[in-house]
Regions:
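Hydrophobic alpha-helical scaffolding
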Residues: 5, 137, 173, 202, ...
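Conserved Class I SAM-dependent methyltransferase catalytic core
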Residues: 35-48, 350-438, 772
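Extended hydrophobic-aromatic, low-complexity segments
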Residues: 325-328, 378-383, 394-397, 418-419, ...
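Flexible, glycine-/basic-rich loop-and-beta segments that form/coincide
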Residues: 427-530
């Protein structure tokens, strides 16, 4: 198995051009460009199948006649045997015979009979394509016959079998599964280039797949024994990755004198790509393997896993990245009802550790799905090669799904290596991509280690772009990467080794105390009139109705409600100058807010707050309290004196209205606990302080100021841990700060680019001096012109 040559790539490009021209010539006035695929893709599959079945057509018809004559009910196995394939067609037609058929409705009937003659496994493929829905349109446009004729052109071979001349020499090469996938991807790109569909779905080039397969198999090549191996791809597309992986494993086994039986398993949500994958497995004679490929719009790997109880030896995939999985999330119960045990695990001291990413990008969910299918009891365990984009390395804060997944992977020591690929290596995207290699049976020298390889500059350019793909990995490039991967664990400019804990950090929350001054001045108290929210609207309503809101609210409510709905009963065509200036402008307030504004209890509650604040003002005066703690104590005493007991929310509203932040004020105490006489207390960095009052000692905790709240990332390998970092980096700048220990979380991120950053070399002094002299010469010339001009 070799990486496709430039000549092979050109040949595939020529085939894609040929098929595109058929589509553009025949379907331009029948379908919009984005719908060409509904006809062209199933036609490609039909032509491939038709070519394979052509040689045994007569034998199949004879066998069918014999079985019918003898009333044999179960005919599938016998007909497959007659066809020499995992599928067959029992109609009297071939595409060549249909080409000679009449046009119009007769051709339609014959073509439908031809489709109906295929075996049940092919019928499912045609159903996924929804191809029968297109036939009448093609007949009405008089293009069905022309399409059949075009796809039978002797200058192109769409078959997985080579076309040979009379002497047995290959005239036209075969179009294998991966070649078909390349053509398919190019056609999809062209079909959708105007509306930019499927931006997150990228067919994986054969050179990348070959590298992935080698990275997956080569470390265990010597351990492969004769026996059965299961390969799995949870986003299998057209099946190219599974095919290359199967070929690689088979070759390795043969090289080591082993006999292996390989079974392929795949799942694909896109009906078209699933149909092509299944069709190509049938074309390869792998009918049993085709039965292990499941797909369709209702077969999402995330929400409808079809292999939940299976474990696999090797897993390979290029899942969609940057693509929403919200539909899957909803099917799985949404954020509140999510309970899939694949993504909620016991890890560390958390029995419900969540491996659930944000709904905008589910690529790491595919990785979790694979990790849950690793073999636990076999000596070889399981190995995984998967492609991700850069966001999988660092997206997600500590405690969020993406970071949790990285933490779960690294703390279980499953990640072996990450390899950065060249830009523009894929057909439909130029973004940075990375191969992750994982295993649950690491070699000793890899345990608790992760290898990063920067192969982004190792490639050879293509003569002609294939979509956005402008380069490829040559055989030498692939071997260079594999050699580096298999080599000794030592750092080079392109290879770095890390401990798994190097990527971990504590995210700590740094708090500082709230410092307030307070004053019961009339203007501050008046703001409590609108303390229940929507201050601007409440102010407008108050401005119109005043104290009537407290005594006549039921009477005023219909009028206020109409105004809030934007319906004042006025004529919209009334001149602006005739409007009553006392009438507030029309509003259209959402129902939830409107409901609260129309609740008389909120207005009465705010009125009560004003009354309580004025009562406190009578006792405390309107002077400034420099210490909010003193203010609260005096306020409570005033309320107690008048027999008024306030709820915590009421106090909070009043304090908020009459207080403001001031750095010079003492910290606001949240909790004050008296210590026993012999009780030992050592203040730390967690926000608990010692306060002494005479002979009494108190443990004091302060209210945090949310405006001053900050976070810091502390490496897990920080010497001295969090405390040492905090004393060195935080306390010198904020002596009153503390750590909210309950909020500390562990996160993991892999800053790949930072590890391989190469700063631009500084220019030498001679270069700088030469530039300065050159600028001086230019400046002198310009100055001479200016001075000379003035003199003139």
């Amino acid at each position: 198995m070799s990486t496709p040559s430039t000549r092979d790539q050109s040949h595939l490009k020529w085939i894609a051009d040929f098929i595109w021209n058929i589509a553009d010539d025949r379907l331009r006035d029948v379908y919009v460009r984005g719908k060409y695929r509904d006809v062209i893709l199933p036609f490609i599959v039909l032509r491939r199948m038709d070519a394979v079945l052509e040689g045994t057509k007569q034998k199949v018809l004879e066998r069918k006649q014999f079985l019918d004559k003898n009333n044999v009910a179960e005919q599938d196995g016998a007909l497959r045997m007659a066809a020499g394939q995992a599928f067959y067609n029992v109609s009297e037609f071939t595409l060549a015979k249909l080409k000679a058929s009449s046009q119009g409705q007769r051709l339609r009937e014959d073509f439908i009979a031809y489709l109906d003659g295929f075996s049940p496994n092919v019928q499912e493929i045609l159903t996924k394509f929804k191809f029968r829905d297109q036939i009448q349109t093609l007949v009405d446009a008089h293009v069905l016959g022309y399409l059949i004729e075009d796809f039978l052109d002797p200058e192109v071979n769409l078959s997985p079998l080579p076309v040979k001349d009379a002497d047995g020499r290959i005239k036209l090469p075969a179009l294998d599964n991966h070649g078909m996938g390349t053509v398919f991807e190019e056609l999809i790109r062209r079909f959708n280039e105007e509306n930019n569909e499927e931006a997150g779905e990228h067919f994986t080039p054969r050179d990348v797949v070959k590298l992935m397969a080698k990275l997956m198999f080569m470390p265990v090549a010597e351990q492969i024994q004769s026996g059965t191996y299961l390969l799995y791809d949870g986003a299998c597309g057209t099946g190219g990755m599974l095919t290359v992986a199967e070929e690689t494993l088979q070759e390795l086994a043969e090289e080591h004198g082993k006999e292996v039986s390989i079974h392929l398993f795949g799942q694909e949500i896109n009906p078209e790509t699933y149909a092509i994958c299944k069709a190509d497995l049938l074309l390869k004679g792998e009918g049993d393997e085709a039965e292990h490929i499941v797909g369709g719009a209702d077969k999402s790997t995330l929400s409808a896993d079809q292999f939940r109880s299976r474990e696999f030896d090797f897993m390979i995939s290029n899942p969609p990245y940057g693509k929403s999985w919200k539909t899957d999330l909803d099917r799985m119960g949404g954020k509140k009802g999510f309970a899939d045990p694949r993504f909620i695990v016991s890890h560390g001291d958390d029995p419900e550790f969540k491996l659930i990413t944000r709904s905008s990008d589910g690529q790491l969910m595919f990785l979790v799905n694979k990790l849950q299918k690793m073999k636990q009891r076999s000596p070889l365990g399981s190995r995984i090669a998967i492609v991700h984009n850069g966001s999988a390395l660092f997206t997600g804060d500590a405690g969020q799904g993406e970071s949790n997944i990285r933490r779960w992977v690294l703390e279980n020591d499953w990640l072996e290596a990450i390899i950065a690929l060249p830009l523009n290596i894929f057909y439909n995207t130029g973004i940075a991509t990375y191969i992750w290699v994982l295993a649950n049976r690491k070699a000793d020298h890899r345990k608790s280690k992760v290898q990063l390889i920067d192969a982004s500059s190792w490639f050879q350019p293509l003569r002609r772009n294939l979509g956005k793909k402008n380069c490829e990995l040559s055989e030498a490039d692939i071997q260079r990467i594999v050699d580096l991967y298999l080599g000794q664990p030592q750092d080079t400019p392109e290879c770095k080794w890390f401990d798994t804990s190097d990527f971990g950090y504590w995210k700590i929350t740094v708090e500082r105390p709230l410092r307030l001054k307070s004053q019961l001045k009339r203007s501050a108290i008046e703001t409590l009139r609108f303390a229940s929210g929507d201050e601007a609207l409440r102010a407008e309503i108050w401005g119109k109705y005043g104290d009537k809101l407290y005594s006549e609210f039921p009477k005023l409510k219909p009028e206020i409600e109409a105004w809030l709905k934007g319906d004042t009963g006025e004529d919209d065509d009334e001149p602006e100058g005739d409007e009553d200036e006392s009438t507030p402008a029309k509003k259209a307030v959402p129902e939830k807010r409107r409901k609260k504004l129309l609740d008389s209890a909120t207005w009465q509650r705010d009125k009560t707050l004003i009354e309580l604040a004025l009562l406190a003002q009578q006792e405390l005066g309107d002077g400034v309290f420099d210490d909010h703690n003193d203010f609260r104590a005096r306020f409570d005493a005033a309320m107690a004196k008048h027999g008024r007991k306030l709820a915590a929310a009421e106090k909070k509203a009043i304090y908020k209205a009459v207080s403001w932040r001031d750095e010079a004020a003492p910290p606001v105490i949240a909790k004050r606990t008296k210590l026993k006489k012999d009780e030992h207390f050592e203040p730390g960095l967690d926000g608990a302080y010692l306060q002494e009052a005479g002979k009494d000692r108190f443990m004091v905790e302060y209210e945090p100021d949310t405006d001053l709240r900050d976070t810091e990332q502390v490496p897990l390998k920080e010497p001295g841990g969090i405390d040492a970092f905090f004393r060195r980096e935080v306390l010198p700048h904020a002596p009153d700060a503390w750590i909210a220990t309950d909020a500390t979380k562990v996160g993991y991120e892999i800053s790949f680019a930072r590890y391989f950053y190469k700063p631009a070399p500084l220019r030498s002094l001679d270069q700088i001096r030469a530039d300065i002299l050159k600028l001086e010469q230019q400046t002198e010339g310009l100055l001479q012109k200016i001075v000379g001009g003035v003199s003139a």
